[in-house]
Amino acid sequence: MSTSIKAIKESLEAVTSLSDPLFQELATDARLGVQKALKSRQKAIQADLAEEERLEAMLSYEKALYKEGYQAIAGIDEVGRGPLAGPVVAACVILPQHCKIKGLNDSKKIPKSKHETIYQAVKEKALAIGIGIIDNQLIDEVNIYEATKLAMLEAIKQLEGQLTQPDYLLIDAMTLDIAISQQSILKGDANSLSIAAASIVAKVTRDQMMANYDRIFPGYGFAKNAGYGTKEHLQGLKAYGITPIHRKSFEPVKSMCCDSTNP
């Protein structure tokens, strides 16, 4: 009596190598269900191998630094430089050496449906996490570039008192005035796993803040657009005027502030 397709599927779930003899054995099974299960598992293993290779490549900066003797490498990234409303948020994350989190990538490349899951995975595995938040008023005072630096410095400061302190910083396209060895990496959130971890922490943190603001200031679509200048947001500005969280140094908000007819 042949093995049931259900039992074969269960056996295949335990297979992690494309060279496993079970694949060769099942290749001669003419049942359509078996062949579908076989191809499905092979495809899944190929995807896992590709993901492992991608994650390994994203650890290249970290591995080079480990060889130099650095022990606690912090990735730093920000979210929210472009929106018309809300804060700029930065995160500083130290992952364990050689830590890999499946699906972790530049937060802009991660499907929104997976943000929370990967964010929680980072929180569980990280040795230390710091978050820096600079509100719209300070952004208007110092400009968004300087505000981004301040948010990153605050994120690093938030690590004070935690067990693990950074001895090296990998920063997404920014150089900070701080006495810690560092490297600025262009498109760092797509090339360094540590920076990618900071990217998703900053993204989820800011999105949660904007969802809360959406309840306080309805009509602008903050929960969906995170403060960016979407059609709904611009329509809200025309209908209801600016809110206390809008950036008055950003257009078209800046022009509306000078318009005495603005509600």
Swiss-Prot record:
Cofactor(s) needed: Mn(2+); Mg(2+)
Free-text cofactor note: Manganese or magnesium. Binds 1 divalent metal ion per monomer in the absence of substrate. May bind a second metal ion after substrate binding.
Gene Ontology BP terms: DNA replication, removal of RNA primer; mismatch repair
Domain (RNase H type-2): residue spans on this chain: 71-262
Subcellular location: Cytoplasm
Entry binding sites for a divalent metal cation: 77-78, 172
Family label: Belongs to the RNase HII family.
Chain's role: Endonuclease that specifically degrades the RNA of RNA-DNA hybrids.
GO MF entries: manganese ion binding; RNA binding; RNA-DNA hybrid ribonuclease activity
Keywords for the protein's UniProt record, in alphabetical order: Cytoplasm, Endonuclease, Hydrolase, Manganese, Metal-binding, Nuclease
Disulfide cysteine pairs (residue numbers): none
Keyword Manganese: yes
Major location category of this protein: cytoplasm
Gene Ontology CC: one annotated term: ribonuclease H2 complex
Record keyword Transmembrane present: no
Catalytic activity: Endonucleolytic cleavage to 5'-phosphomonoester
Record-given protein name: Ribonuclease HII
Entry-linked NCBIfam families: PRK00015.1-1 (NF000594), PRK00015.1-3 (NF000595)
EC number from the UniProt entry: 3.1.26.4
